[in-house]
Design a protein with these regions (language model features):
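Aromatic- and Gly/Pro-rich donor/ligand-binding loops
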Residues: 1-22
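Short loop/turn segments at strand-loop or loop-helix junctions that form parts
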Residues: 2-7, 114-123, 230
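Generic beta-sheet signal
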Residues: 38, 202-204, 228
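Beta-rich nucleic-acid/ligand-interaction surfaces
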Residues: 39-46, 166-176
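Active-site-proximal segments of catalytic enzyme domains
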Residues: 136-152, 156-172
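A donor-sugar binding/catalytic signature common to diverse glycosyltransferases
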Residues: 175-220
């Protein structure tokens, strides 16, 4: 039996994990299964996901007979609704699926407090291939250099998440005591955060698109989550300028 996971925007990492890999919870994984996808030009985080799940998944070409597995569908896409974005069991399924397969080999020295830079986000596959505005910059902090300098002074390590493997990202979120980031796909790894991880999301108070997915994850997994919204929004893509002093005061408050 081969299962085909319904396409749900796999070039965006949140869509890949929650909507598509989350759909695996509908399959009996007590023994190894064959799965396929519409697009077979897999990128790095997709290939790394397959490697972590290689004991239960065998990824095959889609030119065979298959049974379609529906992707996970959002229940609510209204900001501040307080409603579940997807069936919360999806979060617990994914958390157990990956944490049970990731070792502790990554050296977390200097990674206790993290800021995830977003200055390269327009180069990521989803934004690079945006049909309306290819290479669009979304939710970037335009004075990020200033913000990085201030955060480094309080002992925060500033990194580009694109430089790390899926397994390393999972371990960083699981072991760090503080993670600060503009709202981004990388925050899907809050699925694996530890109960001690204080997550601070930076985002304008009037975003142009749905942005409560990480609030939803952290609410159900009982992970500390705060949102810093005292920013100057610059355009319709939620790019912003952040007062680094105000951000530091918020984080330390």
């Amino acid at each position: 039996m081969t299962y085909k996971i319904e396409e749900a925007g796999k070039t965006f990492i949140y869509h890949w994990f929650v909507y598509m890999l989350g759909a695996l919870k509908q399959i009996d994984l007590s023994s190894k299964v064959d799965v396929c996808f519409d697009r077979e030009d897999y990128n790095a985080y997709q290939k790394e996901s397959f490697e972590l799940l290689s004991d239960i998944l065998n990824v095959v070409p889609n030119d065979c007979q298959w049974d379609l597995v529906p992707s996970i569908k959002p229940r609510d896409i209204r900001n501040n609704s307080g409603q579940d974005h997807v069936d919360p069991s999806t979060y617990f399924f994914l958390r157990d699926l990956f944490l049970s397969r990731v070792d502790d080999k990554f050296d977390m020295t200097d990674y206790d407090k993290i800021y995830i830079c977003r200055g390269r986000s327009h180069l990521c596959e989803g934004n690079r291939e945006d049909s309306a505005v290819p290479g669009v910059r979304r939710r970037q902090i335009m004075n990020e250099g200033e913000v990085v300098e201030s955060l480094e002074e309080m002992g925060v390590k500033c990194i580009f998440f694109e430089d790390y493997t899926v397994a390393e990202k999972i371990q960083i979120f699981n072991k760090a005591s503080l993670i600060i980031s503009p709202q981004s796909g990388g925050m899907v790894f809050s699925l694996f955060a530890g109960p001690q991880t204080d997550i601070v999301e930076i985002y304008p108070p009037n975003p142009h698109q749905y942005c409560d997915q990480y609030i939803d994850i952290c609410r159900h997994l009982d992970i500390p989550f705060r949102r810093f919204t005292d920013v100057a929004k610059l355009d319709g893509y939620d790019n912003m300028v952040v007062d680094s002093t105000e951000l530091v005061n918020f984080v330390q408050g």
